[in-house]
Amino acid sequence: MKKLPAIALGTWSWGMGAAGGDRVFGNHLEAADLKPVFEEAMKAGLNLWDTATVYGMGASEDILSTFTKQYNREDVIISTKFTPQIAGMYGDSMERMCDASLQRFGTDYIDIYWIHNPADVERWTPCLIPLLKSGKVKSVGVSNHNLAELKRANEILAAEGFRVSAVQNHFSLLYRSSEEAGILDYCKENDTTFFAYMVLEQGALTGRYSSNNPLPEGSGRGETYNKILPQLDLLLAAMRLMAERRKATISQIAIAWAIAKHTLPIIGVTKTKYIAETVAAASISLTSEESALLENLAAKTGVDTKGSWKHPMI
């Protein structure tokens, strides 16, 4: 695997369509809007881009690929996913979806290829092996898998000399199930990179939204988070104080906390003004006392941000 930066950039909100940026995030972003973001990020050393076929049913990959094609392939790290729930019942469903991604990106390999949701570990994990052997994918990961599923996936791959190189799960101050289930410890013990998505809880942990300034109405994230924003007030107030002491932002505090947990955060950036802020977050350190305070306040919010697509991690 290529050397990974401290932070990945996520493109779930790029493009429109089913499971796309308009429906989930309330965004209506096209390539012209996002090209400056991509270029600014690459200049800043953020070259790890996370996407999935299911994001807009190919729309996110389509937009991202228009930018990656303009760069030396070795300078870009492409992370995309196979989603069993949209794959159909063909024996070669994974290879078909992988080939479609390769075609969109105009490349002959994907750096990190993920099984997006477990569905059936015994059925889908073996399908990664021919992709690894052919070189179509350089490394593989599993997303939204619990500890037992992760261990079983590793056993299946190990029989052919391969391994799960990365895990990608929802992980934030408000949702620490992967830590509670022992997945973070397992990753440390097995030299597996843990990618944390929704570190900012789709904007709810940025301090930019409140009851008076809610997330976009009619969007998936608005439906999920607007009703719980008042419960986050004490947590956000503590994060704001920590940020002010460092001349930082609340978002940076959330990202710094995730990095301190030995995770690689995936941050969705849609505006150039947030690139420098995201890069700088990797240089911020929290004391153990500060982290403990935030975790305690987060637990006291009583909110549950578990997505409908997730199952228990234990």
List each model region and its residues.
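Active-site mouth loops of central-metabolism enzymes
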Residues: 18-32, 82-92, 117
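Active-site groove signature of glycoside hydrolases
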Residues: 104-123
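Beta/alpha (TIM)-barrel catalytic core signal, keyed to glycine-rich beta->alpha loops juxtaposed to Asp/Glu
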Residues: 118-314
